[in-house]
């Protein structure tokens, strides 16, 4: 139960310059508070959805990786590219002109505050990067760990038990009007743990009086900060373990910088020109994030954009195809039903969006193989059907995909389990659960962990198993996208297969009914996901 107490009328316990705001009793220890606060220092997005991340500029104990000595130390936002062609895109986007830059951005020197019972034990300078640099600017901030006892020994091992600890935040701006909107308009913020309670204090400007609105915001932020500290410290005591781990394949900073770049370049025009009945903001920002991840993934795999030809199978509204082609990649999108959006894209994109059904080659081979066991009339009919599918211009052929093909399945439903079996590197983001026949199916859990037994987790686990059986080294990433179905299964490195494609098809119950269900999709309304 979170029931904070207003302590604004009480004397300050940490020095007369500090104004008390709120307090809350605790039953966790100093080590839990310290661990939680260090996590919040490195991830300020925990406190505000406006903030994307923090780049650590310096750490007096050198325990956090920092950006000093890199180009990132000099600017609030830098787009790093792994290849030459993107530089041409930079010329078309004058983002610096539109991005507000605070006057103290190159002020790396730590700032100081006094906390009466607690000397300084550690000083960290970070840069806060907002999600939307066009609306909010970055700011450097000193984060100081104060304590009445030593918190780390000479080997860096924590020794905080029984300590009083204060964490102060001092933003590097010299006037309250330079304070970003996502921060309280004060000189410094303090979170104080004394063993029995946690409290929030502000050091206010002596020559600037807050407006009623600013004062109200300070109160709301104090409440939010206190709640975050209480919740995360309690979680540390309870032995909280992260259930989902992000950024296992692509570095978080590289992904986020790429995402910001794409969002600044495309988001406004894509949202304003949306013609589908679905929520434009969800789809636009989700596909921009997926595009950012793919571009960084391909940067690891290929030297140049020309080295890859992508296929987005089950591409839906074609938005992801549109973004990738605009970014200089070559590829196609395939879906059983055209969408209204297709005609709103530029001609070079529209002509790459194909209204076709996907029939995996192995099903045609299976039909031909089965014909020899059928009576002559039935065999002739089966062979004619296979030949008709192989030559039908409305059927996308998976045979003969180029060697440099990369397959994408972004919530592609019926195709999700098929894509890893198509003998080309791939990334699939599972959504709805279907067997190789196209029929809806709930797969059994692949783990004894209770957290992994949902329909969705079971589907993801099944896709991983299929990928492994056919000979892919399976990688999984939980994408930073606005969707709960955000697991991406990736195959880009070949290993020894455990089964061949026909063995897998047999073990999965076969693909009987796939063609009929694929054709039926053409007559149905598209799914809104």
Swiss-Prot record:
Residues 80-98 have a biased composition (Basic and acidic residues). It is found in: Cytoplasm. Residues 78-107 are annotated as: Disordered. Its EC number is 2.1.1.211. GO terms for biological process: tRNA methylation. Its main location: cytoplasm. It catalyses: uridine(44) in tRNA(Ser) + S-adenosyl-L-methionine = 2'-O-methyluridine(44) in tRNA(Ser) + S-adenosyl-L-homocysteine + H(+). It is an enzyme of class 2 (transferase). Keywords: Cytoplasm, Methyltransferase, S-adenosyl-L-methionine, Transferase, tRNA processing. One of its GO terms (cellular component) is cytoplasm. The keyword Flavoprotein does not apply. GO terms for molecular function: tRNA (uridine) methyltransferase activity; tRNA(Ser) (uridine(44)-2'-O-)-methyltransferase activity. Probable adenosyl-L-methionine (AdoMet)-dependent tRNA (uracil-O(2)-)-methyltransferase. Belongs to the TRM44 family. This is tRNA (uracil-O(2)-)-methyltransferase. It comes from Yarrowia lipolytica (strain CLIB 122 / E 150) (Yeast). The lineage of its organism: Eukaryota, Fungi, Dikarya, Ascomycota, Saccharomycotina.
């Amino acid at each position: 139960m979170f029931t904070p107490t207003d302590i604004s009328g009480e004397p300050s316990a940490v020095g007369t310059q500090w104004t008390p705001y709120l307090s809350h009793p605790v039953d966790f220890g100093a080590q839990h508070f310290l661990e939680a606060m260090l996590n919040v220092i490195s991830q300020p997005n925990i406190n505000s959805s406006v903030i994307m991340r923090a780049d650590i500029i310096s750490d007096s104990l050198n325990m956090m990786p920092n950006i000093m000595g890199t180009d990132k130390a000099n600017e609030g936002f830098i787009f790093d590219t792994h290849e030459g062609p993107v530089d041409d895109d930079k010329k078309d986007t004058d983002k610096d002109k539109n991005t507000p830059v605070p006057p103290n951005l190159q002020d790396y020197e730590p700032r100081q505050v006094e906390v009466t019972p607690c000397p300084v034990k550690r000083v960290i300078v970070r840069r806060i990067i907002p999600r939307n640099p066009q609306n909010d600017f970055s700011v450097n901030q000193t984060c100081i760990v104060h304590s009445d006892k030593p918190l780390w020994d000479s080997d860096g091992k924590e020794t905080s038990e029984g300590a009083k600890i204060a964490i102060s935040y001092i933003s590097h701006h010299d006037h309250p009007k330079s304070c970003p909107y996502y921060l309280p308009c004060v000189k410094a913020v303090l979170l104080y743990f004394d063993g029995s309670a946690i409290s929030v204090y502000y050091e206010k400007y002596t020559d600037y009086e807050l407006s009623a609105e600013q004062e109200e915001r300070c109160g709301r932020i104090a409440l939010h900060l206190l709640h975050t500290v209480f919740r995360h410290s309690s979680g540390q005591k309870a032995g909280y373990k992260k259930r989902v781990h992000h950024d296992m394949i692509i570095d978080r900073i590289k992904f986020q910088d790429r995402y910001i770049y794409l969002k600044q370049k495309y988001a406004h025009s894509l949202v304003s020109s949306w013609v589908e009945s679905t929520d434009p903001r969800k789809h636009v920002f989700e596909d921009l994030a997926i595009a950012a991840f793919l571009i960084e993934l391909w940067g690891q795999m290929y030297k140049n954009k020309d080295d890859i030809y992508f296929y987005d199978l089950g591409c839906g509204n074609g938005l992801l195809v549109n973004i990738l082609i605009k970014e200089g990649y070559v590829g196609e999108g395939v879906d059983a039903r055209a969408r209204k959006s297709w005609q709103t894209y530029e001609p070079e994109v529209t002509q790459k969006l194909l209204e076709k059904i996907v029939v995996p080659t192995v099903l045609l081979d299976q039909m031909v193989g089965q014909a020899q066991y059928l009576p002559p009339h039935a065999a002739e009919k089966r062979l004619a059907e296979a030949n008709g599918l192989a030559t039908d211009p409305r059927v996308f052929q998976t045979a003969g995909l180029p060697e440099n093909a990369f397959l994408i399945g972004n919530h592609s439903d019926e195709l999700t389990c098929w894509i890893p079996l198509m003998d080309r590197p791939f990334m699939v983001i599972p959504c709805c659960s279907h067997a190789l026949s196209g029929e809806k199916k709930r797969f059994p859990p692949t783990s004894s962990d209770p957290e992994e037994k949902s329909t969705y987790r079971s589907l993801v686990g099944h896709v991983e198993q299929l990928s492994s059986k056919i000979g892919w080294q399976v990688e999984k990433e939980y994408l930073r996208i606005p969707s709960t179905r955000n697991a991406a299964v990736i195959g880009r490195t070949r290993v020894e297969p455990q089964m061949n494609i026909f063995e897998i098809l047999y073990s999965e119950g076969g693909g009987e009914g796939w063609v009929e269900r694929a054709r039926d999709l053409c007559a149905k309304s598209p799914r809104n996901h």
